[in-house]
UniProtKB/Swiss-Prot annotation:
Subunit field text: Component of the Golgi-associated retrograde protein (GARP) complex, also called VFT (VPS fifty-three) complex, composed of vps-51, vps-52, vps-53 and vps-54. Within the complex interacts with vps-53.
Compartment(s) of residence: Golgi apparatus, trans-Golgi network
Single GO cellular component term: GARP complex
Record key words, sorted: Coiled coil, Golgi apparatus
Phenotype reported upon loss of the gene: Mutants are viable but have enlarged lysosomes. Egg-laying defect, slow, but coordinated locomotion, and reduced levels of unprocessed and processed cargo in the motor neuron axon of the dorsal nerve cord.
Protein name according to UniProt: Vacuolar protein sorting-associated protein 51 homolog
Organism: Caenorhabditis elegans
Family from the record: Belongs to the VPS51 family.
Length: 700
């Protein structure tokens, strides 16, 4: 029954197949079955057309072939008929000739034998010419073979003068051939095939094997040295050097080893000695070029060259057993990685110096945005460190062959050096640069004190955030853990913060010293005052203005609000010399070495301390009249009122101002102080425009 329903069988029943489909299939199933059958019929029709087309082409081809064969057979039949007629004619001629020459058969045989002898003699006499021709065509093997055969055959006739002359000429060509083979062996430009041919022929003719091997090794050594000389003289960079060595020196080395092993298998030690000497020379040249790199930007080129060199040396170890330069290559990889770390470290310091020089120029050009300058210094450091780490990551890339060495041979020490020798040392170099600016040696001695401030703020920001980020980034990128003996993060942060403290103190002290010197120069006494003071001296007012400007800069840089500049003095002014003497006994002790915090008030306080200390010491060096003391009192009152609003602790200003006034009172024989009510009036008055000589008389 199944064959009746199979469309591929001869007894297929259409009606039974349709009935079966109507019974088993739904309407959708019938539609789908119809589509499948239509598709199958179309495919079958297409296949039939394709088969017919292909068979038709084959039929045409076969027809052409049969026609061509038929034509060839027709031509062959004609040629065979012609050949048959020619053979019949030849057969007839041979029969006739046999009858004519039959009587002289013995004479003909004797004549043939004589001809052979004459022909042999002709070959003997032509031997030197033939050997010379083969020599000129560089068929040295044929020259040697023919001479040996001739020498053996003619040795019994060597007493014959003619034969002796032939042998002498042939021997001369033979010796020339032997010498030419030796020259070919000695020539460094000879290829491997020529060298092999020369060695084989020389050994075949019995040349001393040790002599031939020695000449071969000498020639090989010279060839390798020529390659080394060419490499040393002609290379653009380390990658070019390695590529050229891979194309010339190393293939030549491998070919020499292969040729020698084939010819002198039992004398390999001499070969290895020569090859090691030349490989040491190559390694020294490559190492010199690798370690002479001076630009950290070429790190990618260095890594590519190092990887290619490593792969070539690894291959040589298997191709030439006994020539293992892999340990030296691994040492070179470690040395080059350290060299690249040192280059990156040098570049970081150079970029930092350039960034600081740009900050100095910006401040000379009256740049006001100190915060942007501080951020610039920090960003220069962060960017350069991240760039250096990215370059060093090339040494551990997945496509770098030597990155897959055992960790204790390369990666472990390299990762440690990336953290300690690069990153930690970069922070050390940054700190050393801060020490240079703090010590003020050389040209740095005359820089704007604000450079120290900007530098200090950059270091402070670095220690608060970026330092931790960079250290963690390095440990993550190079798979390091604290158990690897790494420098603790807190140590690095502490070092940076210490330098920031030194720099900000340097800024405060230099700024205070500069302001104090300006104040003293403006207040230098030329003539004792002849009358009671009428206003605060201009130099004192300028000091307050400079202090307010400094306060504004610090506020913009460090944030926070400035104290109101018009705050009033909350303590009772000194009215008599006795009060001043009594207050001086209870003056607050001023500590000039307190830690400076990175805020406006703390820094301003240190500046004010330095200025007032200079002011006090200058007063102690003078002798005052009654009016001079009054002028000092007015100036002190003004300083107390204006500076107390800026510092973090008003007691500091009050105490130091009291010391200044007390010192002036001690330097006067008959001191009289201005009444407190008049002090306020004098401080409120604007500076008077007086002639310079009169203004000078207000000094003390």
């Amino acid at each position: 029954m199944s064959s009746v329903l199979d469309v591929t069988k001869p007894d297929f029943d259409v009606e039974a197949f349709v009935v079966k489909l109507l019974r088993e299939k739904s309407l959708d199933g019938l539609v789908k079955e119809e589509e499948e059958m239509v598709s199958a019929v179309r495919r079958l029709d297409s296949d039939v057309h394709q088969i017919v087309y292909e068979n038709y082409n084959k039929f045409l081809t076969a027809t052409n072939t049969v026609r061509k064969i038929q034509d060839e057979f027709t031509q062959l039949d004609s040629e065979m008929k012609s050949l048959s007629r020619s053979m019949s004619t030849i057969s007839t001629l041979i029969g006739n000739l046999d009858g004519v020459l039959g009587e002289k058969r013995d004479d003909i045989l004797q004549l043939g034998s004589s001809y052979k002898v004459v022909n042999s003699l002709k070959h003997i006499f032509d031997l030197p010419h033939v050997l010379r021709s083969e020599f000129d065509e560089r068929n040295y093997g044929e020259v040697l073979r023919m001479f040996k055969l001739a020498e053996e055959s003619l040795s019994q006739y060597k007493d014959v003068p003619t034969v002796q002359l032939v042998l002498q000429k042939s021997k001369k060509i033979y010796d020339m051939t032997e010498n030419q083979l030796m020259d070919q062996l000695r020539n460094p430009a000879s290829g491997a095939e020529l060298v092999s041919e020369a060695v084989d022929l020389l050994l075949t003719i019995g040349r001393d094997e040790d002599e031939v091997q020695k000449v071969l090794l000498t020639c090989s050594e010279q060839s390798l040295r020529v390659d080394l000389k060419e490499l040393s003289a002609n290379h653009s960079d380390v990658l070019d050097l390695v590529d050229k060595a891979s194309e010339s020196f190393i293939p030549n080395l491998t070919l020499i080893a292969t040729t020698h092993d084939r010819l002198f298998e039992d004398k390999r030690e001499d070969l290895i000695t020569v090859l090691k000497t030349e490989m040491n020379s190559l390694h020294a040249l490559v190492s010199k070029v690798f370690l002479s790199s001076s630009d950290a930007k070429d790190c990618s080129i260095v890594v590519r060259a190092l990887d290619r060199y490593f792969r070539k040396i690894s291959t040589c170890r298997y191709v030439i057993p006994g020539l293992d330069f892999l340990p030296l290559t691994i040492e070179l990889i470690n040395a080059v990685s350290k060299h690249e770390i040192d280059l990156s470290l040098t570049r970081i310091k150079e970029e930092l110096k350039n960034g600081l020089n740009e900050v100095r120029k910006a401040l000379i050009n009256e740049e006001k945005d100190l915060s942007a300058l501080a951020s610039k210094i920090e960003q220069v450091f962060v960017h350069q460190v991240k760039t250096a780490l990215a370059n060093l990551l090339l040494f551990t890339a997945s496509d770098v062959t030597f990155a897959n060495l055992p960790p204790d041979e390369f990666r472990q020490s390299f990762s440690f050096n990336a953290h300690e020798r690069l990153l930690v040392q970069a922070f050390h170099r940054f700190s050393e640069l801060a020490d240079e600016y703090e010590s003020g040696a050389g040209e740095i001695r005359f820089v704007d004190p604000r450079v120290h401030l900007v530098f200090a703020v950059a270091l402070q920001h670095l220690s608060n955030k970026s330092a931790v980020y960079l250290l963690n980034l390095c440990r993550e990128q190079f798979s390091l853990s604290p158990d690897d003996g790494l420098t603790d993060i807190t140590v690095v942060m502490s070092e940076v913060k210490t330098r920031a403290q030194k720099l900000v103190r340097c800024y405060a002290e230099k700024t205070g010293l500069s302001m104090g010197e300006t104040l003293i120069k403006g207040c230098a006494m030329l003539v004792q005052p002849a009358a009671t003071p009428s206003a605060v001296r201009a130099s004192v007012r300028r000091l307050v203005e400079e202090m307010n400007t400094c306060d504004s800069e610090l506020t913009l840089l460090l944030g926070g609000d400035s104290k109101p500049k018009d705050s009033r003095v909350s303590r009772r002014p000194i009215t008599t010399a006795l009060d001043a003497a009594r207050d001086s006994l209870w003056c607050e002790r001023i500590d000039f070495h307190l830690q400076i915090h990175f805020n406006r008030a703390s820094i301003i306080t240190v500046i004010v301390k330095v200025v007032l200390k200079i002011f006090i010491e200058s007063i102690r060096l003078q002798t005052y009249s009654k009016f001079g003391v009054e002028q000092v009192q007015v100036d002190c009152y003004y300083l107390q009122r204006c500076l107390a609003a800026l510092v973090s602790d008003e007691v500091v200003v009050n105490s130091m101002v009291d010391q200044a006034l007390s010192s002036a009172l001690k330097r006067c024989q008959d001191p009289v102080l201005v009444h407190p009510s008049r002090l306020a009036q004098l401080c409120e008055q604007p500076p008077a425009n007086r002639p310079s000589s009169q203004a000078s008389s207000l000094g003390y």
